Amino acid sequence: MPLFILTETSAGYGLFKAADKKLLSSDNLAERLNSVEKITKEIKYKEFAKFESAATALEEIAGVVEGKVTPKLNSLLAEIGNEKKVTLAVAESKLGAAINKIPNLDIQPIADSTTTDLFRAIRQYLPELIPGMLPENFKEMSLGLSHSLSRHKLKFSPEKVDVMIVHAVSLLDELDKELNTYAMRVKEWYGWHFPELAKILPDNLSYARIIVTMGMRSNATTADLSEILPHEIEAAVKAAADISMGTEVSEEDLQNIKYLAERVIDYSVYRKQLSDYLENRMRAIAPNMTELVGALVGARLIAHAGSVMNLAKNPGSTIQILGAEKALFRALKTKHATPKYGLIYHASLVGQASGANKGKMARQLASKVALGVRTDALAEFPEDADDETRASLGIRSRAKLENNLRQLEGKPIASKGVSVGPNGIPVASAPKWDIKEARKYNIDADGLAADAEAPKKPLIQEVEMQDAPADEDEEMKDVSKKSKKDKKEKKEKKDKKAKKELDDEDFERLAKAAGMSVDKFKRRFERGQISIKEDGTLEILSKKDFKGKDAEAEEEAEEEEKPAKKSKSSKRKAEAEEEETTKEEKPKKKKKKSSKE
């Protein structure tokens, strides 16, 4: 039974034949193969199947590691399969099991501890066993194949380097702090010379560019600032420079201020470049998550988790509170309410929600982010797939979330790029510079209005009314209360008439403008939660505001009832006093009659 030896190298498959059939059963195998002369006598070169390229080498070796018989290896084994009862020594046990399953191949593979010393000696003297193989070339091929195999095992892809995102977002946060510190220092430093400039130019980058371009404020008339500022702002800067209250500075002081202003400009330009890089990298690595929460929030989530794969392993509930670990454990320790959101709070969809809806929106968004980041980490797309195809799940999920938010809020939501305030109302982005006119005093407000009514009663009558008995005051109060009730009833009747005058077409039009169904709009309109203003616009009250109005109305009604009860009790007291006086007067009259008699 002949003994063959199969060796996998970085250059190809090597097939050798042992001179002694019982070589593996030898007790002193290591001593028989401890030199070049001895190993060349014991092992003879039979054939070498060379790999055509590095890609082929990676494919073949990866198949061997996974225990697969590749077509190239199968053709090599077919040459020795013609011999009867062949024994084949193999280094990989998985490969030996796979060779044993090949049909029509009478080969008995051996892959146990007896082959360890044999393959150790072959690897040590491999260049001497294969003719034409140089040790230098063999080392280079082994190094290249080991790198390629490591990439293959780790599923490495140059487009999915999430470490770059972690470093980029950390650097972006540090840049913001440094830039803010330097910009404030420049304003304080240059403010001694030209303090009015900080009020005219709130933008840090424009402020620094003005310092570098203009220098001393005395150069404002000759300096060309049109490339930096609009015409109106340029005129305001030059006018303020002429009447500035700042102190004079030396050229050396100004030179150091300019150096710091240049650093602010360089940092601002680099920050913009880094922000664009982070946006592009996030769209390449996590397009679905970027579509849902934005590039900056998504990058912070990845940095907090450590990698895209680590973030993909987390459920939606963990992603929802990621970044609020201190508050979570403090709440669990003190047995208080746990936080509803962490880093995801800064997403635009959560920011547009108001009040209690923020928690609901954060929970829904976190569940969609969990699905999106798993797709980003594990899904495989063709190389020619466009960005929209890669982010299709995120686009669909965002559309659903926007619809849910519209139903929760009962109003149309802001567009994707609009910044939102803490109360859920979109905030208009402030311009870099703006000149506001001072409000003038309204002189007409001092005079009496032309339609003002003259007092109905002279002052003497008012004094008499104050001296009148309390019963008349109570009667006047009752009359005023009745008039108020009549006014309220009239208003309610008018509102009911206005509601009845609306047609189905009007309800459909108004419901579409409010972003809700017709039935829902009718219910809220009849309830009073939605009202139509004089200019035709809708006033939609949230549940909290509507409940607050009802509570205020109930309090007013209770306050009105209290004086009514007091007036009734006072009337009863007055009647009781009158009865007592009449009883006292009757016996007095009887006494007078008896005295006359």
UniProtKB/Swiss-Prot annotation:
GO terms for biological process: box C/D sno(s)RNA 3'-end processing; endonucleolytic cleavage in 5'-ETS of tricistronic rRNA transcript (SSU-rRNA, 5.8S rRNA, LSU-rRNA); endonucleolytic cleavage in ITS1 to separate SSU-rRNA from 5.8S rRNA and LSU-rRNA from tricistronic rRNA transcript (SSU-rRNA, 5.8S rRNA, LSU-rRNA); endonucleolytic cleavage to generate mature 5'-end of SSU-rRNA from (SSU-rRNA, 5.8S rRNA, LSU-rRNA); protein localization to nucleolus; snoRNA guided rRNA 2'-O-methylation. Residues 452-597 are annotated as: Disordered. InterPro entries: Nop56/Nop58 (IPR045056), NOP58/56_N (IPR012974), Nop_C (IPR042239), Nop_dom (IPR002687), Nop_dom_sf (IPR036070), NOSIC (IPR012976). One of its GO terms (cellular component) is nucleolus. Residues 532-551 have a biased composition (Basic and acidic residues). GO terms for molecular function: snoRNA binding; snRNA binding. It is found in: Nucleus, Nucleolus. Its main location: nucleus. PROSITE patterns: NOP (PS51358). Residues 552-561 have a biased composition (Acidic residues). Keywords: Nucleus, Ribonucleoprotein, Ribosome biogenesis, rRNA processing. Residues 285-410 form the Nop domain. The keyword Ribonucleoprotein applies. Coiled coil: none annotated. Residues 482-499, 588-597 have a biased composition (Basic residues). Required for pre-18S rRNA processing. May bind microtubules. PANTHER family: NUCLEOLAR PROTEIN 5 NUCLEOLAR PROTEIN NOP5 NOP58, NUCLEOLAR PROTEIN 58. Belongs to the NOP5/NOP56 family. This is Nucleolar protein 58. It comes from Neurospora crassa (strain ATCC 24698 / 74-OR23-1A / CBS 708.71 / DSM 1257 / FGSC 987). The lineage of its organism: Eukaryota, Fungi, Dikarya, Ascomycota, Pezizomycotina. The gene is nop-58.
